Amino acid sequence: MTCINNYQKERTQMSNLTKEEIIAAKTDLGALRKVIAEGELIIKVRTPICFPCNMATRWTNERGLEDGVDYLEIDVTEIPGSDEYLKNVVAAKTAPVPAGEKEQVEHHEFVDAVIKGEKTTDVSGVKIQTPWIFNLAKLSFETKDNEDTQLYGYQPSNYESAMFKEHLANKQEANKVLAAA
């Protein structure tokens, strides 16, 4: 069994959310959109009858991570339309910047545009039935085919990268470090 003391690291916390905002985001799609657009969250997505979701819950519990403190857990069955919205958020964060637009678009600008319906995004590669722990602040536009979501919490082996600040912020930084060695 892994020693829990190994995970007493600096956590990425959701310090700006009130209790009311957390409750609203779990039950209302509009409130969830607002919270995602305004913050740099870690979101834990849960789907029904999902063994990997239970594994993710066990992983967070073993490390003392708390829903509403360290991440926001969303049950897609409790918010009408949230599954489609979350697909679009992840796809928007991992899609290449469309031709003719500024290359260094801020992630919140891109997500805001998706929320307002100003951009269309192909979400065919996003697996909504797969549970996620993903860190919106760490996702970038540098990779394609959802590599970022794989890297930052899409799989149980990567949860730690999503939840703790001390890990490298993106794969490109890791590659720079390796190239310089």
PLM-predicted stretches and their roles:
Residues 27-67:
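Local sequence-structure signature of Cys/Sec-based thiol-disulfide redox active-site neighborhoods
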Residues 44-45, 68-107:
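Thiol-based oxidoreductase modules, predominantly thioredoxin-like and allied folds used
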Residues 1-13:
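Short, Lys/Arg-enriched N-terminal segments with co-localized hydrophobic residues
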